[in-house]
């Protein structure tokens, strides 16, 4: 069956327009359109609905066309030809890998298909995106080839969706109003085959889908003078502008030709959310506590060549991203530290702006490298009162609690001594009976009581006299010194008040 399918495809690719129209009319398909559109429909028909009657009709049309050649002695098997090589405009073909036509119905970027090359060139590869699960490859990474010396170039691409793909898109859930989970996305990157490439837009990019322009992510605003604004290069969703049927879709990519080479690819993907990735991480990414404990021992193992011995390492239970207590502690396997960050907030931040950089060591921490620390998860459930722990050399741990600052206030009760207020009442005392006794006639009794308490071994109370202050005490000392001087010198002589002339007495 596979050999017959390959033979039928080779026959279809060598048909003329009239042969293609007869074949499509035989099965009741539309016969209108350009030749590459007719070839697309015929290849789609052969790949997914190749019945014995259809194969017989293809063979009949082929033998009718090549009747004279088949009558010649020594007929040779038909060689695979390019679908548009015989009836196409003389335009520059694309450079790229060998094409499997049944998989892609419209690999006619820049208007031409491609001949299979004998020397297999390495293909352009794109990095895997955690939030996009690839379902089908609609167009392999294909280089954008300029057709003229103009700076602004246009590259068209024509393809059709299979009924199964259309059904998947229609039956998928909505992530938000008008946005399906299953999408047809366009990805653009540099034409570099040395390593997987990240998405990168060419200058002056514009994407048109079936006569309607598709929105492309804009630039981030830059507040720094002289710094070019950056653009988030992400997959471009084309689903809302496509024909969700067997009709042919046409995509035109407009781009600026400034010396760099770019490639485009089309994929059918399922977009995931941060909750989906978190659930997957909890399922397959949890590291056993014993393995984490062995890692701690390895970190704290005594190195004979080192003069400094590490007896413990402190790990904070606060997430460095949001300064909150960890709920799902995780880190990358490539990180050398034991400090973890919260997987919930890390995935949410990368869903909004994908960077995938570790917030602890600022090194790449891709989703495929993330693990959930089982030991730290267990510690979080057991140690609720501390925000920091210390791992010890034998693999155990202890909580680090914040030390309270020493207080300057006295430990015992304070007795307030003072004179009676204006109403003749004694001031309030912290200990009933003691303050009033000291300020009244019964102070001796209270003093005896205080002495008795000291003799019984109890700590005495601190006595503070609030009626004394620095100013009053200094004045009292000055008055006492003046009185002493007066007593020593005797009575002072009377001073005579000088009388000024010109003054009139008041009386």
UniProtKB/Swiss-Prot annotation:
Query: Start and end residues of each SP-RING-type zinc finger?
Result: 304-385
Compositional bias per record (Acidic residues), positions renumbered to this chain: 474-489
Q: Which residues form the PINIT domain?
A: 112-272
Q: How is it modified after translation?
A: Sumoylated. Lys-35 is the main site of sumoylation. Sumoylation is required for TCF4 sumoylation and transcriptional activation. Represses LEF1 transcriptional activity. SUMO1 is the preferred conjugate.
List the PROSITE patterns hit by this protein, alphabetically.
Answer: PINIT (PS51466), SAP (PS50800), ZF_SP_RING (PS51044)
Q: Which residues bind Zn(2+)?
A: 335, 337, 358, 361
All residue ranges annotated as the SAP domain in the record: 12-46
Q: Where is this motif: LXXLL motif?
A: 20-24
Q: Which UniProt keywords apply?
A: Acetylation, DNA-binding, Host-virus interaction, Isopeptide bond, Metal-binding, Nucleus, Repressor, Transcription, Transcription regulation, Transferase, Ubl conjugation, Ubl conjugation pathway, Wnt signaling pathway, Zinc, Zinc-finger
Q: Which residues carry this modification: N6-acetyllysine?
A: 107
Q: What is this protein called?
A: E3 SUMO-protein ligase PIAS4
Q: Which organism is it from?
A: Mus musculus
């Amino acid at each position: 069956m596979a050999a017959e399918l390959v033979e039928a495809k080779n026959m279809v690719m060598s048909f003329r327009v009239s042969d293609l129209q007869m074949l499509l009319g035989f099965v009741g398909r539309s016969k209108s359109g350009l030749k590459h559109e007719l070839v697309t429909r015929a290849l789609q028909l052969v790949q997914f609905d190749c019945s014995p009657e259809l194969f017989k009709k293809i063979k009949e049309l082929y033998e009718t066309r090549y009747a004279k050649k088949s009558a010649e002695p020594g007929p040779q098997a038909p060689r695979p030809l390019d679908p548009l090589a015989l009836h196409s405009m003389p335009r520059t073909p694309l450079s790229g890998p060998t094409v499997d036509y049944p998989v892609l119905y419209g690999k006619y970027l820049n208007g031409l298909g491609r001949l299979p090359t004998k020397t297999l060139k390495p293909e352009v590869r794109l990095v895997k995106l955690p939030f996009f699960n690839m379902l089908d490859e609609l167009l392999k990474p294909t280089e954008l080839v300029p057709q003229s010396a103009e700076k602004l170039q246009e590259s068209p691409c024509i393809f059709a969706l299979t009924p199964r793909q259309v059904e998947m898109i229609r039956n998928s859930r909505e992530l938000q109003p008008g946005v399906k989970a299953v999408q047809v996305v366009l990805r653009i990157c540099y034409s570099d085959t040395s390593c997987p490439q990240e998405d990168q837009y060419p200058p002056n990019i514009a994407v048109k889908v079936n006569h309607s322009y598709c929105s492309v992510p804009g630039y981030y605003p830059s507040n720094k003078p002289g710094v070019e604004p950056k653009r988030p290069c992400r997959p471009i969703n084309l689903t809302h502008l496509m024909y969700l049927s067997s009709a042919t879709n046409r995509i035109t990519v407009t781009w600026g030709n400034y010396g760099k080479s770019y490639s485009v690819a089309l994929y059918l993907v399922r977009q995931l959310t941060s909750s989906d990735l978190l659930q997957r991480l909890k399922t397959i990414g949890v590291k056993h506590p014993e393995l984490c404990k062995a890692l701690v021992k390895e970190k704290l193992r005594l190195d004979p060549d080192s003069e400094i011995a590490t007896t413990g390492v402190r790990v904070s239970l606060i997430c460095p991203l949001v300064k909150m207590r960890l709920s799902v502690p995780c880190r990358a396997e490539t990180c050398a530290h034991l400090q973890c960050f919260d997987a919930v907030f890390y995935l949410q931040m990368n869903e909004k702006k994908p960077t995938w950089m570790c917030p602890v060591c600022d090194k790449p921490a891709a989703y495929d490298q993330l693990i959930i620390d089982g030991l730290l998860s267990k510690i979080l459930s057991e140690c609720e009162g501390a925000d920091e722990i210390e791992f010890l050399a034998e693999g155990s741990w202890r909580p680090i609690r914040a030390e309270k600052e020493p207080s300057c206030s006295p430990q015992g009760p304070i007795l307030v001594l003072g004179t009676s207020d204006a109403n003749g009442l004694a001031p309030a005392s912290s200990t009933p009976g003691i303050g009033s006794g000291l300020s009244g006639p019964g102070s001796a009794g209270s003093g005896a009581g205080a002495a008795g308490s000291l003799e019984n071994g109890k700590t005495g109370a601190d006595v503070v006299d609030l009626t004394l202050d620095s100013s009053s005490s200094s004045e009292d000392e000055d008055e006492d010194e003046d009185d002493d001087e007066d007593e020593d010198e005797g009575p002072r002589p009377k001073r005579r008040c000088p009388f000024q002339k010109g003054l009139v007495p008041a009386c």
